A protein has these predicted regions:
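Conserved PLP-enzyme active-site core in the AAT-like
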Residues: 27
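Active-site-proximal beta-alpha core segment in soluble small-molecule metabolic enzymes
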Residues: 2-4, 8-11, 16-19, 30-179
Length: 179
């Protein structure tokens, strides 16, 4: 049942989405992977509908915050790769593997936890390594004198049994601030 208590809403023009996708694709080139972030219901814009459009357009990946968001996309017919940017409890690793969902790993403790659980389940979990480049966000710290230790930890995580490291990323949450 639709709520009539709110007086504001957003209407997403999927033709405009397609135009913007093609503009970005031209800008970065066909050899660069395209990941559409649709977390928090596409920031309130309808994650399933936007994801279907991006899948049809040829995007390579989607990103969400949590396993429940990823499961909603799978239930909505999304078959393309999905990356979970947030934490997933270790007891859900089998679901990640079974649903072909990629998990972000932001520290050695999580890498070890996911590795142990994937091995216990008899599967392989695809992961992307999250790097903190000095903005005090989650991730392996590789700035401010931590480069050698951080990269060593990343290399160790990439070699853990039960994990298949596919990508690496960072998050410029406040990139316009000087520090």
């Amino acid at each position: 049942m639709e709520s009539t208590l709110r007086r504001t809403w957003a209407e997403i023009d999927l033709d405009a989405l397609a135009y913007n996708y093609h503009a970005l694709r031209r800008r970065v080139g066909a050899d660069v992977k395209f990941l559409g972030v649709v977390k928090a219901d596409g920031y309130g814009h309808g994650a399933v509908q936007v994801s279907r459009a991006l899948q049809t357009l040829g995007a390579d990946y989607l990103a969400v915050s949590s396993l429940d968001e990823a499961m909603e996309l799978r239930a909505g017919g999304i078959t393309m790769p999905i990356l979970i940017l947030g934490h997933t409890p270790r007891e859900q690793v089998k679901n990640l593997i079974d649903l072909h969902i990629t998990q972000a790993v932001s520290c050695q403790a999580k890498a070890l936890e996911y590795s142990q659980e994937a091995v216990r389940c008899g599967g392989e979990l695809t992961v992307h390594i999250k790097v903190d480049t000095g903005m005090s966000r989650l991730g392996y710290l590789v700035s401010g004198g931590h480069f050698a230790a951080g990269t060593a930890d990343i290399c160790t995580a990439c070699g853990l049994p039960g994990l298949r490291a596919e990508g690496i990323f960072t998050h410029f949450a406040v990139s316009d601030e000087p520090d």
